[in-house]
Amino acid sequence: GSRILRHDPRSGETTDFRRYTNRTNGLAFSADGQLYGCQGGSRRIVRFNADGSTSLLEYRLDGHFHNHPNDLAIDEQGRIWFTDPYGRLPAPGPQLQGPLDHASVLRLERRVDRTWTIRRMTYDTTSPNGILVSQDQRTLYVAESDYGEDKRRELRAYPIREDGTLGPYTVLHTFGIDQRGVHRGVDGMCLDTEGNIIVCAGWERSGPGPMIYVFSPSGQVLETHPVPVDRPTNCTFGDADLRTLYVTTGEGHLFRVRNTGRQGWLLFPPP
């Protein structure tokens, strides 16, 4: 466990890229090909350097450790937007300082001297999960995935204002409760070239089950595709033409979906 794997679609071989990553979750490449990750075990965003080392970014918001970063998205200005829910597993060292009194979307951005600082961006989330920036950089998509019966599981769209702050969100889709229990809501997600949102959602214990959904930018459900195992966790397009969808699951699977009829959109494709 606690590894980052590298899959070669040409050979079909999957190998260790990094081991002992301290429960790293969401990953994203920057414009210069650097790989950044949400290191939940250390409650930090980190950069995985080519020489095998790891660089730590700023991890304090107003002097306090933030929570347990889950997923991240890097915009064309190089700012790192990340979701910061409360962790379900303890972090050994940083637990000496308790969590924040909120679970928000935060943003890492550079100061003039190139050091990092953190800003709080949302004040209306309780368990933010997957996150994306739209192609035109004007919308932030956030999965609010709080599992309580009286909580919200929504796919949200926040307008990104000219000054970089977020406007009031629009709910694109709500995941409710059925006779079997609470829907899991959205986990990870990605975009296609038409701006549609491909999301991993659901589980076997309630609702229509584990599923890949395709939403239009306005929230219309364009497609649903059942997943044969429980808890799809994240997805991205890959291969040379970005027409193959790769899906991970909480059970440790990696699925490859060909002939999707879609082409993925990545602001910064892997080097």
Regions found by a protein language model. Give the residues of each.
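Sequence-structural signature of mature extracellular/luminal beta-sheet repeat domains
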Residues: 1-271
